[in-house]
Amino acid sequence: MSPPSVLLLHSRIPLQPRPFRMNSRAAPSRVVVCSVASTEGFISAAPILLPDGPWKQVEGGVTAAKGFKAAGIYSGLRAKGEKPDLALVACDVDATVAGAFTTNVVAAAPVLYCKHVLSTSKTGRAVLINAGQANAATGDLGYQDAVDSADAVAKLLNVSTDNILIQSTGVIGQRIKKEALLNSLPRLVGSLSSSVQGANSAAVAITTTDLVSKSIAVQTEIGGVAIRIGGMAKGSGMIHPNMATMLGVLTTDAQVSSDVWREMIRMSVSRSFNQITVDGDTSTNDCVIAMASGLSGLSGIQSLDSIEAQQFQACLDAVMQSLAKSIAWDGEGATCLIEVTVSGANNEAEAAKIARSVASSSLVKAAIFGRDPNWGRIACSVGYSGIQFDANRLDISLGVIPLMKNGQPLPFDRLTASKYLKDAGDAHGTVNIDISVGSGGGNGKAWGCDLSYKYVEINAEYTT
């Protein structure tokens, strides 16, 4: 299965409240700002941009689905402060498990460990996540640290070691502070809870340079049975396909066969986390782990072609896209989210590649930060995407402002276009770029953020 990529660590930055609103243009998503109970003193929650569909947002994050508990505690892994830095998501039963991982050749020890576990086991019981040290480029000792951590969690939960998955985020080249981690595990396991607070504390514990935590839970009905999907993610910098700098944990109480579940996760990742970019860096640690408890009561989904599978896939896509957009919205130093929508391509893959090319362009990102409607940079990034199309069929719009039609530039009010960009930045809202390359049936989206002076400052001082 072809997977993703993930991230790094930074000492906590005091959170500056970010007002959020959608631009006046109607968008197919609902904006919900989540609260983070007892953890809000450390970090607030990201806005959730949930696509419209036959589902509703519910409380609970990764604990919303039946059978799941979570916890996040401070264990001394971070350089300073008492922000939670160790999280655990556990299932009461053997859950069908799937994963997607970084494409970076220098994959971190926990990534290598998880890939090995998933190659030999179809089920999982828990995911342990630490922040502070990435445990990447740490050799054999780093890998043993991951094994020892999994073994310790397994003993406390009274399950097999190969049912424990590990994720790490932090500074590359640093092994985990294993003694502090192992000493904290009894307290972490004792803190496991199916409450909203349990989910929120875990979502905060996995953050690094993030200014907001990312957590969501959705309920839908399939075959007359209520199904829940929950998720949490982290990521703010070192984000670029494949699988942008990020960690993610997904939970559901649907019953899905192993092969179908793994293919569903692969498809959803390709439409979400692989479609976000902040800075063009593919992390060593990117990892998404997804667990299905099967406790909802719905008969198992055994085929991708069934109506139930298609309904479930759409909801899974929506959850992952919501988390992905929250990551891009929270890009290091960003003032706005960029959403690129491409239509008219030959197929979904080609549309997605064009959208990624535009969202990844440093010149496009810098122009948006400068509130400069320099649409030529958009056209340029479409052209070098590697996808062949008829340039005389190219249409480009910025928000509701048409800039190019059938390959011909259109007159437009630059002050109005600049104000559109400024309003989005002032409100930490969304800049929409719409592109059509023909009359094909392929559609795709990608998400990014603008490129500001603050991004350079954050990363220039990362380990100092």
From Swiss-Prot:
Residues noted as binding substrate in the record, renumbered to the chain: 208, 234, 245, 332, 459, 464
Record Pfam families: ArgJ
Entry EC number(s): 2.3.1.35, 2.3.1.1
InterPro entries, sorted: Arg_biosynth_ArgJ, ArgJ-like_dom_sf, ArgJ_beta_C
Site-annotated residues for Involved in the stabilization of negative charge on the oxyanion by the formation of the oxyanion hole: 169-170
Family: Belongs to the ArgJ family.
Assembly mode: Heterodimer of an alpha and a beta chain.
Function field: Catalyzes two activities which are involved in the cyclic version of arginine biosynthesis: the synthesis of acetylglutamate from glutamate and acetyl-CoA, and of ornithine by transacetylation between acetylornithine and glutamate.
Protein name as catalogued: Arginine biosynthesis bifunctional protein ArgJ, chloroplastic
Organism lineage: Eukaryota, Viridiplantae, Streptophyta, Embryophyta, Tracheophyta
